[in-house]
Amino acid sequence: MLSFRADDHDVDLADAWARRLHIGRSELLRDALRRHLAALAADQDVQAYTERPLTDDENALAEIADWGPAEDWADWADAAR
């Protein structure tokens, strides 16, 4: 559980948005916090990738993943019928 002080204007804006979205203020603030933390984590991921890009071995795995299925099995969709 978190508890913090905020400017009256910010509280009024949060209340207005919560009413507009038909959700509770706590849900609005939880979602906003979760989104902000995800954005911060993404920024760290970008920085880590910039400082240490993927190796050739790691890129080879991505190429394998792009191969897809070896054969087209679409004609087997009705095989059990």
Swiss-Prot record:
Does Cytoplasm appear among the keywords?
A: no
* Keywords in alphabetical order: Toxin-antitoxin system
Q: Which GO terms describe its biological process?
A: regulation of DNA-templated transcription
Task: Enumerate the InterPro entries for this protein.
Answer: CopG
Q: Which Pfam families match?
A: RHH_1
- Outline what the protein does: Antitoxin component of a type II toxin-antitoxin (TA) system.
* Subunit-structure text: Forms a complex with cognate toxin MazF2.
Please report the name of this protein according to its UniProt entry.
Probable antitoxin MazE2
Report which gene this protein is encoded by.
mazE2
